[in-house]
């Protein structure tokens, strides 16, 4: 991913070549993989979007495994339950969040979303996870709960719209380049 896809995109499309203009987002299982890849490469991504996969930040239940392009030693963070486990920033993702000020400097947006409808534990757990991140000093985390939707395209369309708007705002621009 990092060694092949980013150079290919930069070669074939008009892009700005720095991390401050690079985002990665994924939905469902792709959201989990996005978390794994971006957290292993916070020097390459400033905007991280986890659509119905935001549960990958922090403790709880989960599946494990590293994504292609991620450091195989990276410890992925499992999904939150309705009451997420305590958050240990020193151990998840090999400590990428251990220094909250440094993480906030590197990652401008950590966006997580779920649908509001059952299983409601996902949305409630995600809200609690964000509270834990903020309490631990991770200030650039954002949660969106899609009203009247579940694990479906409506949630993901709304999530992409919200993530894109937030990312442009956090970059301090009023329009996309």
Mark where each language-model region is:
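Non-catalytic cap/lid and distal C-terminal segments of serine-dependent acyl enzymes
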Residues: 1-177
């Amino acid at each position: 991913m990092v060694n092949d896809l980013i150079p290919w995109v930069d070669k074939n499309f008009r892009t700005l070549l720095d991390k401050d203009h690079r985002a990665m987002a994924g939905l469902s299982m792709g959201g989990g993989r996005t978390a794994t890849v971006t957290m292993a490469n916070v020097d390459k991504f400033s905007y991280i979007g986890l659509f119905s996969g935001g549960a990958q930040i922090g403790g709880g239940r989960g599946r494990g495994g590293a994504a292609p392009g991620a450091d195989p030693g990276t410890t992925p963070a499992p999904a939150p339950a309705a009451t997420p486990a305590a958050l240990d920033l020193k151990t998840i993702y090999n400590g990428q969040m251990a220094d909250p000020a440094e993480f906030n400097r590197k990652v401008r947006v950590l966006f997580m979303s779920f649908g509001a409808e059952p299983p409601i534990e996902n949305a409630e757990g995600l809200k609690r996870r964000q509270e834990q991140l903020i309490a631990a000093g991770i200030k650039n985390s954002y949660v969106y709960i899609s009203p009247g939707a579940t694990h479906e395209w409506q949630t993901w369309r709304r999530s992409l719209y919200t993530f894109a708007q937030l990312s442009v705002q956090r970059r301090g621009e009023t329009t996309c380049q």
